[in-house]
């Protein structure tokens, strides 16, 4: 079992054969060592009990029922013994079958298909050989002829040669006899995973690193040849050298040996992670992993028999069986990676180990990263433009369920409910006092919103919850960038931070208005897009006619009366909004707005000529420009300025000013101490 106090992180790396053996092997009180799975059996067809030394063996993985051994004895009866001497099963809890592992001792080394076939191929990069050549070697289509010792021997072949070549059979017919071929193969040639393992074990990683760096440096200093094909060839060689340098450096830094990419011991998962379930009338359903494990054990045992009877087994048959073992292990680890997957009797591909752990429904994302936790909920998100940037709308039904413990404490603390049962009854009846207490609690308690997949830290942010009607979570449209969310049916999870540390972290680090910039690039994240940009464009669109809008229509008719159509004057934002609500002006109608005594915009006022100039008897002048008016006294000083604008632009400018003032107030509020909420 993994305890949180003992383990703080998880590291995934290559395991040595000794480490794999240490995971599975255990010494029983009688001195017997168990852990190796040698039989391809699962459950007995009559008793439905695990077979000894099989894939569900109770001696290896632990008892099916806590305190009961395979022969039916109880721990209470055998209270002075920790295991049953008759069947060898320990008296422990059955949950050990969730983490106790076994192993299969392979009769020949098997190349791990992840490091061979996955791109980039680590084995091909480390050995600096083509992937097709290595594949032919792994699956016994080619043989590696290379002397192990440096002593002179009769036959020394260099490189690779094809097994199907008939000239080989004609030249060396005696070596293809049973014993001659075996002796020749053990000394001079290798194929399958054994050939890969020998090459990897003979690698000097520091030498590979040094020579690759020297060659890469020479290629970098080399000038272009002018031939496009040669330049591409040199670039591919440089890319290969860079990959070799990185790979060799990582192996040296982590103290991992390259030959560990070839398996000699195959781990067997705990039986609870690959269960076999009994249905009605004795019918059994099993995990696909069990069938794949059985195929590996069957073929491995056959190879063991061939090697044990080497005197009567043809060498070609042994080579074919080595290939079958390699393909069986490939199907267990990653079925279908080489093309045609292994299928069952219903022509359905088996679900391999890679299929179990990868993807959205894999072990990591489904069971480890996607656990269900208390004080959390999930619902569809919809747009909430009326919210502030740091707010989110929680449905009443969800909020009362999430904050139920806090509401109960508030009811009992205020003596509104005598006990827990009465408080729950009030919540179920949805009495009005419940919502008042809930609002008070939510004012001082942030919530965390998370949208899967959480690819960076902006995938989970804190918000101030607001009670709303309906069943969907309301979200401000500007925070969708960090979540990569849109309102086409996306769902988000709500979490309640319980501890004071979690609440402090949510307030200081995770609030949405404190995460406006991308932590990776520094670019703004909360930027308007899509319908927001379209709405802002329509709101602030300019009336192209401007002050000339009444030139073609100087009069207007209302209630059979004709009035002079003049551009209206307003002294404040409120007057404009009031006139717009009373439908006296339109959204894009041009109007004059009083702008104080100073022109707060950068303009070419000294070069622009007025359209019209008016003087009165007291010496006050009116200069009318295309976008503004200046009212000056005798000394030519401005004491009144009007600007030409529209209702939409005034609404937009008013919202911007209120947002800036709200930010200033919020910053002043953060510097003050927060009042305590008594419940």
From Swiss-Prot:
InterPro entries found in the cross-reference section: DNA-dir_RpoC_beta_prime, RNA_pol_asu, RNA_pol_N, RNA_pol_Rpb1_1, RNA_pol_Rpb1_3, RNA_pol_Rpb1_3_sf, RNA_pol_Rpb1_clamp_domain, RNApol_RpoC1
Family per similarity comment: Belongs to the RNA polymerase beta' chain family. RpoC1 subfamily.
Record's function text: DNA-dependent RNA polymerase catalyzes the transcription of DNA into RNA using the four ribonucleoside triphosphates as substrates.
Bilayer-crossing regions: none
Cellular compartment(s): Plastid, Chloroplast
Cofactor binding mode and count: Binds 1 Mg(2+) ion per subunit.
GO cellular component: chloroplast; DNA-directed RNA polymerase complex; mitochondrion
Cofactor dependency: Mg(2+); Zn(2+)
Keyword Transcription: yes
Subunit composition and interactions: In plastids the minimal PEP RNA polymerase catalytic core is composed of four subunits: alpha, beta, beta', and beta''. When a (nuclear-encoded) sigma factor is associated with the core the holoenzyme is formed, which can initiate transcription.
UniProt GO molecular function: DNA binding; DNA-directed RNA polymerase activity; magnesium ion binding; zinc ion binding
Keywords: Chloroplast, DNA-directed RNA polymerase, Magnesium, Metal-binding, Nucleotidyltransferase, Plastid, Transcription, Transferase, Zinc
Protein's UniProt name: DNA-directed RNA polymerase subunit beta'
Keyword Amino-acid biosynthesis carried by entry: no
């Amino acid at each position: 079992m993994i305890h949180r106090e003992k383990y703080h992180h998880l590291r995934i790396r290559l395991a040595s054969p000794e480490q794999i053996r240490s995971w599975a092997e255990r010494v029983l009180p009688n001195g017997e060592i168990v852990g190796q799975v040698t039989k391809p059996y699962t459950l007995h067809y009559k008793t439905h009990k695990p077979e000894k030394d099989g894939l569900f063996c109770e001696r290896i993985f632990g008892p099916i029922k806590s305190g009961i051994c395979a022969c039916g004895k109880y721990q209470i009866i055998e209270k002075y013994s920790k295991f049953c001497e008759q069947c060898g099963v320990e008296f422990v809890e059955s949950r050990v079958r969730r983490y106790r592992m076994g192993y299969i001792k392979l009769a020949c080394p098997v190349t791990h298909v992840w490091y061979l076939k996955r791109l980039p191929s680590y084995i091909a990069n480390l050995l600096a050989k083509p992937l097709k050549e290595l594949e032919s070697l792994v699956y016994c289509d080619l043989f590696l002829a290379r002397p192990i010792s440096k002593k002179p021997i009769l036959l020394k072949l260099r490189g690779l040669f094809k097994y199907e070549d008939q000239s080989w059979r004609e030249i060396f017919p005696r070596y293809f006899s049973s014993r001659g071929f075996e002796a020749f193969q053990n000394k001079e040639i290798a194929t399958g995973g054994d050939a890969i393992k020998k090459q990897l074990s003979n690698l000097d990683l520091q030498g590979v690193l040094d020579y690759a760096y020297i060659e890469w440096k020479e290629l970098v200093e080399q000038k272009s040849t002018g031939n496009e094909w040669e330049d591409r060839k040199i670039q591919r060689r440089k890319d290969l050298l860079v990959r070799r340098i990185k790979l060799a450096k990582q192996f040296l830094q982590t103290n991992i040996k390259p030959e560990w990419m070839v398996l000699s011991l195959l781990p067997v998962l705990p039986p609870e992670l690959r269960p076999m379930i009994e249905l009605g009338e004795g019918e059994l359903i099993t995990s696909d992993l069990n069938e794949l494990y059985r195929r590996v054990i069957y073929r491995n045992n056959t190879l063991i028999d061939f090697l044990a009877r080497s005197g009567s087994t043809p060498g070609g048959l042994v080579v074919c069986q080595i290939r079958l073992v390699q393909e069986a292990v490939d199907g267990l680890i990653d079925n279908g990676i080489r093309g045609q997957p292994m299928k069952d009797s219903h022509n359905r591909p088996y679900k391999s180990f890679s299929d179990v752990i990868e993807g959205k429904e894999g072990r990591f994302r489904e069971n480890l990263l996607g656990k269900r936790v208390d004080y959390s909920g999930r619902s569809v998100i919809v747009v909430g433009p009326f919210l502030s940037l740091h707010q989110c709308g929680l449905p009443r039904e969800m909020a009362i369920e999430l904050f139920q413990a806090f509401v109960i404490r508030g009811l009992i603390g205020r003596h509104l409910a005598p006990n827990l049962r009465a408080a729950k009854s009030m919540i179920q009846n949805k009495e009005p006092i419940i919502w008042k207490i809930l609002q008070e609690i939510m004012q001082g308690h942030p919530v965390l919103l998370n949208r899967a997949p959480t690819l960076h830290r902006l995938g989970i942010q804190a918000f101030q919850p607001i009670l709303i009607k309906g069943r969907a979570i309301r979200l401000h449209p500007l925070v969708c960038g960090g979540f990569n969310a849109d309102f086409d049916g996306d769902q988000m999870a709500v979490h309640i931070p319980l501890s004071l540390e979690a609440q402090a972290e949510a307030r200081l680090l995770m609030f949405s208005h404190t995460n406006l910039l991308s932590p990776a690039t520094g670019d703004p994240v909360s930027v308007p897009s899509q319908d927001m940009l379209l709405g802002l464009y329509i709101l602030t669109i300019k009336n192209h006619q401007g002050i000339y809008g009444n030139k073609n229509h100087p009069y207007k008719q209302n209630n059979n009366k004709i009035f002079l159509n003049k551009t209206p004057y307003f002294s404040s934002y409120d007057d404009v909004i009031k006139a717009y609500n009373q439908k006296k002006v339109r959204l894009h109608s041009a109007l004059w707005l009083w702008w104080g005594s100073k022109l707060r915009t950068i303009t070419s006022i000294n070069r622009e000529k007025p359209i019209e100039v008016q003087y009165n008897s007291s010496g006050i002048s009116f200069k009318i420009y295309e976008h503004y008016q200046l009212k000056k006294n005798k000394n030519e000083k401005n004491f009144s300025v009007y600007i030409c604008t529209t209702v939409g632009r005034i609404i937009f400018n008013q919202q911007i000013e209120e947002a800036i003032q709200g930010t200033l107030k919020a910053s002043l509020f953060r510097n003050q101490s927060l009042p305590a909420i008594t419940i």
